[in-house]
Amino acid sequence: MKCNALALTALVSAVSAQAPAPPAAPVPTGYFSVISARSASPIHLLPLQARGGKFYLGGAPPSSYCPVEVVGDACPPGNTTVLVGGDKTLSMGVVVPGGQEVYIGPDGAMSYTIAHSVFVPEGSVRDQWSREAPATPTQAFGYLHFETGFVACPSAGNATDYQVFGQVDGAKFGPECLGFNMLAGTFPGSSTSLKKNTG
């Protein structure tokens, strides 16, 4: 009887060791906006803003454009930076031919392509993005990740915003720069209501 119990235990252990891991949570889809998370810091809960081809935490609203002559009164306010993707690649949530890709430049700066252009500087990182769903259905935020993490540094001459960087080889950050997480929340809108960002 002892032998059978040991054999059964060994069999159960072997089967559980072979059981496939539960599937990872699906990558969220759709449009989303981002705020920063770094408790007890000047960047905690600041919105991510796209301006002039780069990304910032806080400061002025995003730079955007809506062709009133084409869209008329349907132009949205353009005061929120909206993203889409996060399954290796990332883009701005805009309606413009070719879209606007988000990448980490060779200097580490989180950047985006200008409208109607696919140019990305040589040495940029384009495919290390991932998006994580909220841990439970009651949580409002998931995460946007860059494989090696994010850093925010005070903008030159501006105490109200911080430029966002990805931690890449060769990029140097001073002690005034802060590592942080990006909290991703679903954006209630459709692509047709989003403006293109100006460079």
PLM regions with names:
Residues 15-18, 37, 85-87, 93, ...:
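Compositionally biased, intrinsically disordered low-complexity segments
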Residues 51, 57-108:
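Short, well-structured hydrophobic secondary-structure segments
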Residues 1-21:
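Fungal secretory targeting signals
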Residues 10, 59, 67-69, 145, ...:
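Residue-level signal for mature regions of secreted extracellular proteins and peptides
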Residues 6, 69, 78, 155-156, ...:
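General secretory precursor processing signal
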Residues 4-9, 81-82, 88, 192:
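Intrinsic-disorder/low-complexity peptide segments enriched for small residues
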Residues 19-56, 105-199:
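Extracellular glycan/ECM-engagement signal in secreted proteins
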